[in-house]
Amino acid sequence: MTEIIIRPCTSADADRLSIVAAATFIETYAGIVDGDDLVAHCHVTHAPSAYAGLLADPGKRLFLATLDPGAAPVGFMLMGEPDLPVETGPDDMELTRIYALHRFHGVGLGPRLMQTAIDTARTAGKRRLLLAVYSRNERANAFYRKMGFRQVGTRLFHVGVNDYQDWVLALDLQGTGLGRA
């Protein structure tokens, strides 16, 4: 029997994060973003050295989802202080990335990662969880709506020579629903 384990990342997880991040980014944006731009973006943004830097940053929180037995990486999430073009305050935290390999969509991994994010933010005393999502990523947007997020702004996300419109979403951690303990 296989089981998905979600655990805090360690400094040894940079390669695992890099692999699952690049794979999920390509799975999601192939056919939307130019192939050369995808590869260049992943080469920089999802390089092991980029994740080593994030893992060394005390302001970042990373969790890895692995398949047991074997501990193959199948998803992860990254959180930290907000860096979004909306008004934020000390009670806010940003869920910068929440990625799962497509094979693991629909098996409860997304809600488990989201609950981990909510619990992490609440434990840190945060009252609102923010994230940005590509406006045309219908599956992700439906998931976030189901989780209780609402749109509070927009931003442009630059990949290669193109800009893509993201929606900035927020979840009130003091309200009802999943954000509630």
Where are each of the predicted segments found?
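C-terminal "cap" of GNAT-fold acetyltransferases
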Residues: 3, 63, 89-93, 127-141, ...
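Acetyl-CoA-dependent GNAT
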Residues: 4, 8-14, 18-33, 37-103, ...
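Active-site acidic-Proline motif in GNAT/NAT acetyltransferases
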Residues: 101-103, 107, 135-136
